[in-house]
Design a protein with these regions (language model features):
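Bacterial lipoprotein signal-peptidase II cleavage site
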Residues: 24-34
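Conserved C-terminal helix/tail region of periplasmic/extracytoplasmic solute-binding proteins
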Residues: 364-399
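C-terminal motif of bacterial Sec signal peptides marking the signal peptidase cleavage site
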Residues: 19-23
Length: 399
């Protein structure tokens, strides 16, 4: 694949959230979300003939038809194989995707973890009958029945791809090889003006994760379930960091340019960004998953509860998670494929090693994006802070 598409400011806008959730955890060691039952929506019991059309909402790069690069096309082969004409609406943020799904005009969506539970509890998506998606059987087990894609053991989608928000640094400037997020929080003054961070309220979770591991007295159990006291501590840490941040980034090209120009030397990143910088060969960078773990994303293909073309949507979910196509998508987009067999199909033989695609131990250290709720998503009570509060705090942090 010639160039990656990556999400840009996927969570940078405020989310209008009014969902009552039961207990759940963002840790990959928890099996599914348990608690308040979502609205009853019937799942498809058996596949029928394709309806001839498919309307989906997707991140840029998830449904390529050759228009961006004529060699990158899995939409047309799908149409030829199934007879389902694909119409794609590009979603720019999770918030936008949620609103589009609520119109009932689409058959499915590639939802990130900060959107999935909202869609489930609003009754906008249907449970998925995984028996009707043959390729589901070889999806990485650590992505199945997770808090962001299932409720009480029932899958609400098919895992597509995932990635971590890792630490990147310039080894010729940064002294030693950092192993902790402390390098950009408590130790950031050493690189004053050259520290960078993700520009979104959800970045508060990164600070919360660091405090969860280093300040046990705060009793943080989940970086997305913060009481007022815990949120205050995370905000204080980020205000301290802000004094040393040269610039925040949401567009990946901005971070590439910052590292290549030398205006940034350390900060949070995506692996694909490090790969782009490495390919440009203007400056050397290294990445590490710090000892505290990291935040990250896991995307899921979900079926609308109002789908007019459910059979075509099921055909799409099976095709997009086939070994060949999932490999194509992963390399083009810049993320780990969900399909275990995809690793034998990548054009870059080292791709899955670079993205830790089959490394369950690595994946277990990722706390995937989840929208903060007043009712704590870790099941600890109803005294947590909602995302709207995070938005306000983020504005204060940046001044």
């Amino acid at each position: 694949m010639k160039r990656p598409f990556v999400r840009i400011a996927a969570t940078a806008t405020a989310m209008a959230v009014a969902v009552l959730l039961g207990g759940c955890s963002t840790s990959t060691t928890t099996t599914g979300t348990a608690g308040v039952a979502p609205p009853k929506v019937a799942e498809l019991k058996k596949l029928g003939a394709g309806e001839g059309q498919l309307n989906i909402i997707a991140w840029a790069g998830y449904a390529e038809d050759g228009s961006n690069d004529k060699t990158v096309d899995w939409v047309h082969p799908f149409e030829q194989q199934t007879g389902c004409k694909v119409n794609v609406k590009i979603g720019n943020t999770s918030d936008e995707m949620v609103q589009l799904m609520r119109t009932g005009q689409y058959d499915g969506v590639s939802a990130s973890g900060d959107a999935t539970l909202r869609l489930i509890y609003a009754g906008d998506v249907a449970p998925v009958n995984t028996a009707l998606v043959p390729n589901y059987s070889t999806i990485s087990s650590f992505l199945k029945k997770r808090p962001w894609n299932s409720v009480n053991g029932q899958m609400y989608g098919i895992p597509h791809g995932w990635g971590a928000n890792v630490l990147m640094y310039n080894p010729k400037v940064v002294t030693g090889a950092p192993t902790s997020w402390g390098a950009v929080f408590e130790g950031s003054s050493a690189y004053k003006g050259k520290v960078t961070a993700y520009d979104s309220p959800i970045y508060i979770a990164d600070a919360a994760l660091y405090l969860m591991k280093t300040k046990p007295s705060l009793k943080i159990k989940d970086p997305y379930s913060l009481t007022e006291t815990q949120l205050t501590a995370a905000v204080a840490l980020l205000k301290q960091q802000n004094a040393n941040v040269g610039e925040y980034w949401a567009d990946y090209t901005k971070e590439v340019q910052a590292f290549e120009s030398g205006s940034s030397v350390i900060g949070t990143t995506w692996q694909v960004i490090a790969n782009v910088i490495g390919a440009d060969k203007k400056v050397q960078v290294k990445t590490v998953l710090p000892k505290e773990g990291a935040t990250g994303w896991s995307d899921t293909w979900m079926v609308s509860s109002k789908a007019k073309h459910p059979n075509c949507m099921y055909e799409w979910m099976n095709t997009i998670t086939s070994a060949k196509v999932n490999a194509q998508v992963a390399e083009w987009f810049g993320e780990a494929p969900a399909q275990t067999k995809a690793c034998s199909q990548t054009s870059d033989t080292g791709f899955c090693t670079t993205y830790h695609a089959l490394d369950s131990a690595y994946a277990s250290n990722i706390h995937y994006w989840t929208t903060p709720q007043k009712q704590c998503v870790d099941g600890s009570g109803n005294d947590c802070t909602a995302y709207s509060e995070w938005v306000n705090k983020w504005q204060q942090i940046k001044g």
